[in-house]
Amino acid sequence: MTFRMSDLSDLARKRVAVAAYYFVPGLVFASWASRIPDVKHLLHLNNGQLGSILLAIPLGQLLMMGFSGVLVSKLGSKKMLVVAEVFYAAVLLAMGCSSTVFHLTLSLVGFGMMANLMNIATNTQACLVEKLYGCNIMSSFHGLWSLGGFAGGIVGAVFANTVLPIEAHFGTVLALSLLILAAGFHFLVNDEQARAEEEDVPKFSFRTIDPVLFLLGLMGFAGMFCEGTVYDWSGVYFTSVVKPDEVFIRAGYVAGMGAMTLGRFLADGFVTRYGAARVLKVCGLLILCGLLLATLLPYLVTATLGFLLVGFGISSSVPICYSIAGKLGTVKASIAITIVSSISFFGFLVGPPVIGWLAEVSGLRMAISIAACLGLMIAFVATKVSKRISIDTDSRANAF
C-alpha cells in the first residue's frame, strides 16, 4: 500500500488534536489539585470535611457511568468530547468561585460527571486514531495527560505564590484550555467513518457480552487500585515507615509519577514489538516486585526504587486494556471502553480506602504488600487472555 504525504499529514493532525484533548484535562485536574490547600483554608474546612467534600468527584463519575457510553455511541465521540472538555474546564472556574461548601460540592459533582463523559469520549477518539495509524499509540495519549498534569502543577505553584486570587488562576487555565480545544476541534476524527465500520458489530446485550471485556476491566481495576495507592499513600508510607529526611518525603511519589509518565511514552513501542499480552505480564510483575521491594526493604533508596518500578508497571496497564477493548469488535468501541473503564475506575475509587482499612488492622507495610498481589493478578489474567488479544496487537507499523 502506498501512502501519500497528504495522508500522513492528515493523520498527524488528528493525532496531535487528540493528544491536545488529553493534555487539557491533565492541565485542568492538576490546576484544581494544586489549589486544594488554598480552598480548604478559604472555606475553613478541617481534614474530615475536606475528605467528605472530595468524594463528590467520584460521586459525579458514578452518576454519569450509565449514560456516558450511550451518549458517545448515539451522538458521537467528537461532539461529546468537545462538550465534556469545555464544561470540565468551565466547572474548574466555578469551583474557584465557590464561596460556600454547598456550591463547591455541587461543582465537584459536575466536575466528576464531565470527567466520566470525557474519559469515554477521549479514549474512543484515541481508538479511532489508533485504527487509522494501524499501530499502537494509545499509551502515548495517556502520557499527554500526565504531561498536562505536570504543566498544571507548575502553573498552580506559580499562581499560589502570587497575590492573585484562585479565580484568576482558574480563569487563566479556562481561557488557555478553550484556545487549545478550539485549535484541535477541526482535526478530531469524524464519527461517521466509525459508524460505517461498526454497522456489522452486534448490538450490545448483557447476555452476549464478551467475557474478555470483564477480564480487561479486572486488569484495569488492579492497575488503577495500585495507581490510587501511589497517589494517596506513597507520601504517608515514606513519612511513617521509611522516615527519611523531610526533603525526601515525596521521593516515592515523584519516582512513581515520573516513571508512569515516561512509561506511557515508551509503552507503545514495546506493545508493537512484543505484543500487548507480554507487556501486560511485565507490567503486573513490575507492580508485584516494586511493592514487595518497597515494603520488605523500607529504606530510602530501596523504597524509592520500588515505587519507581510500580510507576512503570501502572503506566501502561490501563491504556493497553482500553486499546484492546476498542479493537475487539464484539460491541461498539464506545460501549467496550465504557465497560472496561467503569470496572477499572472502581479500583481507583476503592483502592486508597481499602489500603487505609487494612493499615488499621495490620499496619501500612502489610497493607501495601497485600496490594502487590494485584500485580500478580494482572500477569495471570494477561496470560489467560493472551491468545485472544494477540490478534489485535501484532501491527508492526511505525508511528510518526
Predicted feature locations:
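Short amphipathic helix-loop junctions that connect adjacent transmembrane helices
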Residues: 34-48, 232-248
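Interfacial helix-cap and linker-helix signal at transmembrane-aqueous boundaries
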Residues: 39-40, 71-72, 158-163, 238-239, ...
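Helix-breaking motifs and short loop linkers at transmembrane-helix boundaries and internal kinks
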Residues: 44, 76, 97-102, 275, ...
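Conserved MFS/SLC helix-loop-helix module at the cytosolic interface between two early adjacent transmembrane helices
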Residues: 63-102
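Helix-to-loop junctions at the C-terminal end of transmembrane segments
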Residues: 64-77, 160, 263-276, 359-360
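Structural signature of the two symmetry-related core transmembrane helices
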Residues: 79-93, 278-293
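Helix-loop-helix hairpin linking two adjacent transmembrane segments in secondary transporters
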Residues: 103, 140-189
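Cytoplasmic helix-loop-helix junction between adjacent transmembrane helices
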Residues: 108-144
